[in-house]
Amino acid sequence: MSPVFNVNVGVGQSSALSPILFALYLLPLIYILEKYLKNLEISILIISFVDNGLFISQSKSFDISNSRLFCSYNIFSNLLKKFSLVVEYFKTEIFHFNRSRGTFNPPPLNLSSLESNILRPNNIWKYLGFIFDKKLTFH
């Protein structure tokens, strides 16, 4: 390993090289996270497209789903800290899908104990140009 030294140049966000460097740097962290979650038997699917990452939990119980998301977020934010990276809390969102016909009022995900905020579920979710609603009606 080389010694640590200061660098006064970088790659801009609009550069074609940015997503490649981001993926090369972040992919080992995602791999480590997946191994941690598997060992802890926490069922979470991780999807990443450039710098947009998703933790997906499927459960009929909000408590179970939120618990899985909380643990995943905690482990991932700690991994990021070890690599001198941080989660942009203001960009963190939670969204629940439910196709039942009854009242749908999902609980928030409280991340305040992890130096983050309380995530209140959104009514719509925009991801990579697609707009989703809670019932997946795509109107």
Question: Language model features by range: what are they?
Answer:
Residues 1-4:
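Reverse-transcriptase-like RNA-dependent polymerase core
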Residues 24, 28-31, 71, 78, ...:
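Ordered, helix-dominated protein-protein interaction surfaces in large eukaryotic regulatory proteins
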Residues 18-25, 46, 68-72:
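Hydrophobic (often cysteine-bearing) scaffold residues that line and stabilize catalytic clefts
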Residues 10-18, 40-61, 80, 84-96, ...:
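Catalytic palm active-site di-aspartate
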Residues 58, 62-66, 139:
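A generic structural signal for short coil/turn motifs at secondary-structure boundaries
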Residues 86-123:
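Short, conserved micro-motifs composed of acidic
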Residues 65-84:
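Inter-domain linker/hinge segments that demarcate the starts of reverse transcriptase
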Residues 7-37, 137:
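Conserved pre-motif C helix in the palm subdomain of viral-like polymerases
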